[in-house]
């Protein structure tokens, strides 16, 4: 699994991986490319990111903006041409263990900085309202 950053392509990284293996005497290893997609990035100054930050701050959360995620998703469909739209992840709820047997989402929270399911859903309404301003 290779995670790309801007200005990289899957083909370029695959070629570099094969060259790296060959230089170290592992040229006989077969690398199977099963698919992939381009990296994605959105400016922190994009209106959708500013709207997300505004909602989080109103709820007493000082957000940390991460330019890259440990996970992956095909965001390039939105951020690359021809759409060239901003994209970001947002929410006041909490979950973990994504895509695993122990995946969870907090339904009712006792932590004032972590919304339960209802607060998380309402945060999207607030976010869309902020974005529409």
Short names for language-model regions:
Residues 1-11:
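Midchain, well-structured core segments that form catalytic/ion-binding scaffolds
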Residues 61-132:
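Zn-dependent metallopeptidase/amidohydrolase metal-coordination segment
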Residues 33-40:
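Juxtamembrane "pre-transmembrane" interface segments
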Residues 13-21:
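Short amphipathic alpha-helices in soluble, non-transmembrane regions
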Residues 21-25, 56, 60, 128-132:
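Structural signal for hydrophobic packing residues in well-ordered secondary-structure cores
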Residues 27-33:
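Short beta-strand elements
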Residues 40-58:
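Short, low-order "capping/linker" segments at domain edges
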């Amino acid at each position: 699994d290779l995670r790309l950053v801007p200005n990289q392509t899957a083909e370029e990284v695959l070629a570099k991986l094969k060259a790296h293996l060959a230089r170290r005497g592992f040229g006989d290893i077969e690398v199977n490319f099963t698919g992939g997609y381009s990296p994605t990035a959105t400016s922190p100054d994009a209106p959708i990111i500013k709207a997300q930050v505004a909602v989080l701050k109103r709820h007493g959360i000082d957000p940390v903006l991460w330019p890259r995620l440990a996970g992956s998703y095909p965001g390039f469909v939105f951020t690359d041409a021809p759409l060239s739209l901003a994209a970001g992840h947002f929410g006041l709820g909490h979950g973990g263990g994504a895509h695993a047997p122990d995946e969870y989402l907090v339904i009712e929270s006792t932590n004032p900085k972590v919304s339960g399911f209802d607060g998380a859903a309402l945060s999207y309404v607030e976010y869309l309202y902020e974005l529409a301003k």
